[in-house]
Amino acid sequence: MIRLAKREDAKEIVPLIVQAIEDIVFMLTGTTSYEQATPILEYYVQSEQNRLSYHNCLVKEMDGKVVGVIIAYHSLELSVLDREMLEIISRNLNIQNVKVDKEADDEDFYIDTLSVHPGYQGKGIGTELLEGLLSFAKNKGIARVSLNVDQDKPSARRLYEKVGFKYEKVRFIMNHSYDYLVFPISKKIFETKVV
């Protein structure tokens, strides 16, 4: 079932985040190892107001286990969502005025992360999470959803295009190029229920 995440899901969500964003976790935590980053990521997921907060996550649960996650939020909320994270990065790196590259256009509901446990890949869970998120966004009156896909991951791009996302432009994040894909919500209505 696709459901809203709970605070206690953090320990299962964090490895999925790490799997999806890899070394970006170091930038988001101001650390240099996964061992250092993991407790900070768990804190982010458990927090009430953060880009990675459980409030921004939908999860796929099977057999009592979280096997997939999709994280999304409105781009205009990032200045508030990132406040505490930027303070943590600043403190850990001992630098002032840390900035994070802009990942989404202001009008977009942005998909930050989509990740499925390796043992459950190829079973349609990524598609189900995407469709659940799009259904959730439609019910909230959101007009457009966007995401960045690594240009080195053509299979991920195919998944997004299969669901209906379209290429809009190239975006550079942390000196790496990503294809920026968008989905106008009015285009399609999904029946995936989120509980």
Predicted regions and their residues:
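Conserved GNAT-fold acetyl-CoA-binding loop/helix
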Residues: 22-45, 56, 90-91
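Conserved GNAT acetyl-CoA-binding A-motif
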Residues: 107-109, 137-148
